[in-house]
């Protein structure tokens, strides 16, 4: 007797980060308006850009536009290539004590400065709206929500817009950077997932098995097509943080999108998935920092 053919996989639904980010920004604008109506100060965000790297300039421009949309005042500090660590440290000290500034954003990478961590640690943790300061990461590790790293927090918001439960699910994170992979693991642990982290020392067979077992897959490495779409578990939620420009000019993620989209339940596009959520979450953190300051 011939076995029945397996049911055809339905194409994944797109997690439209642009739309969800716009909804978040609209809500933040209402909160800023209410804050101003109550006689409180306008939230202020210092945006520090060193050099003229094209990619960094695009990111900063998007952040400034988002700030304008929600009513946050952006204070621009566009510094020349060759700005020293000492000069940046002096600027951070000035911003730390400026009552008009509720959030400080240092756009990374910093050209000519090999260790940006010293500067990040110099930012007042109460104004660290990127969520990179060790004190804020430590609060997250202790399950004390404060200013959380923007990309992982934005991904949690994306997950809330699916019809998939998070608690009790198997989650695999590929990539363990300080800004995405590691705090993403903390976020998913807090949400009740069983978390597996994969990195450059993970054997290929273990990586494949971990991906195939993932109900929630987050990939943040920066290598186009690192994860074949055929590895994706049917019905999984796929969050592709990678954004890579190919020789032909196309932007692609770290996951083979076409094959993954035929297997996943939900998947983020690249571009238009995680990136807009990171920017919107930066505004969310800035407003929360202003609210905490009074």
UniProtKB/Swiss-Prot annotation:
Origin superkingdom: Bacteria
Pfam family, one: THF_DHG_CYH_C
GO cellular component entries: cytosol
Keywords, alphabetical: Amino-acid biosynthesis, Histidine biosynthesis, Hydrolase, Methionine biosynthesis, Multifunctional enzyme, NADP, One-carbon metabolism, Oxidoreductase, Purine biosynthesis
UniProt pathway: One-carbon metabolism; tetrahydrofolate interconversion
Disulfide bonds listed in the record: none
Record note on quaternary structure: Homodimer.
Function, in words: Catalyzes the oxidation of 5,10-methylenetetrahydrofolate to 5,10-methenyltetrahydrofolate and then the hydrolysis of 5,10-methenyltetrahydrofolate to 10-formyltetrahydrofolate.
GO MF annotation: an example: methenyltetrahydrofolate cyclohydrolase activity
Annotated NADP(+) binding sites: 175-177, 243
PANTHER family according to UniProt: C-1-TETRAHYDROFOLATE SYNTHASE, CYTOPLASMIC, C-1-TETRAHYDROFOLATE SYNTHASE, CYTOPLASMIC-RELATED
Gene Ontology biological-process entries: L-histidine biosynthetic process; methionine biosynthetic process; purine nucleotide biosynthetic process; tetrahydrofolate interconversion
The protein's name: Bifunctional protein FolD
Family stated for the protein in its record: Belongs to the tetrahydrofolate dehydrogenase/cyclohydrolase family.
InterPro entries (UniProt xref): Aminoacid_DH-like_N_sf, NAD(P)-bd_dom_sf, THF_DH/CycHdrlase, THF_DH/CycHdrlase_cat_dom, THF_DH/CycHdrlase_CS, THF_DH/CycHdrlase_NAD-bd_dom
Catalytically driven reaction(s): (6R)-5,10-methylene-5,6,7,8-tetrahydrofolate + NADP(+) = (6R)-5,10-methenyltetrahydrofolate + NADPH; (6R)-5,10-methenyltetrahydrofolate + H2O = (6R)-10-formyltetrahydrofolate + H(+)
E.C. no: 1.5.1.5, 3.5.4.9
């Amino acid at each position: 007797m011939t076995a029945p053919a397996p049911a055809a996989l339905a194409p994944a639904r797109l997690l439209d980060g642009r739309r969800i980010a716009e909804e978040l920004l609209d809500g933040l604008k209402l909160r800023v308006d209410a804050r101003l109506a109550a006689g409180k100060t306008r939230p202020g965000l210092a945006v520090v850009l060193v050099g003229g790297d094209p990619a960094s300039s695009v990111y900063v421009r998007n952040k400034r536009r988002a700030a304008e949309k929600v009513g946050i005042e952006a204070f621009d500090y566009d510094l020349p290539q060759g700005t020293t660590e000492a000069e940046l440290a002096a600027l951070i000290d000035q911003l730390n004590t400026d009552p008009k500034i509720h959030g400080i954003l240092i756009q990374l990478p910093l050209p000519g400065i090999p260790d940006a961590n010293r500067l990040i640690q110099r930012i007042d943790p109460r104004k660290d709206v990127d969520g990179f300061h060790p004190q804020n990461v430590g609060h997250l590790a202790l399950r004390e929500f404060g200013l959380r790293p923007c990309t992982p927090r934005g991904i949690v918001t994306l997950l809330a817009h699916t019809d998939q439960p998070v608690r009790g699910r198997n989650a695999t994170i590929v990539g363990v950077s300080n800004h995405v992979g590691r705090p993403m693991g903390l976020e998913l642990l807090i949400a009740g997932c069983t978390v597996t982290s994969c990195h450059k020392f993970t054997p290929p067979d273990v990586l494949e098995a971990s991906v195939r077992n993932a109900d929630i897959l987050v990939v943040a490495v920066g290598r186009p097509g690192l994860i074949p779409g055929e590895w994706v578990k049917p019905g999984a939620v796929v969050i592709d943080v990678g954004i890579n420009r190919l020789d032909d000019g196309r932007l692609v993620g770290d996951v083979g999108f076409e094959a993954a989209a035929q297997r996943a339940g939900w998947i983020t596009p690249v571009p238009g998935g995680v990136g807009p959520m990171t920017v919107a979450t930066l505004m969310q953190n800035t407003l929360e920092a202003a609210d905490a300051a009074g």
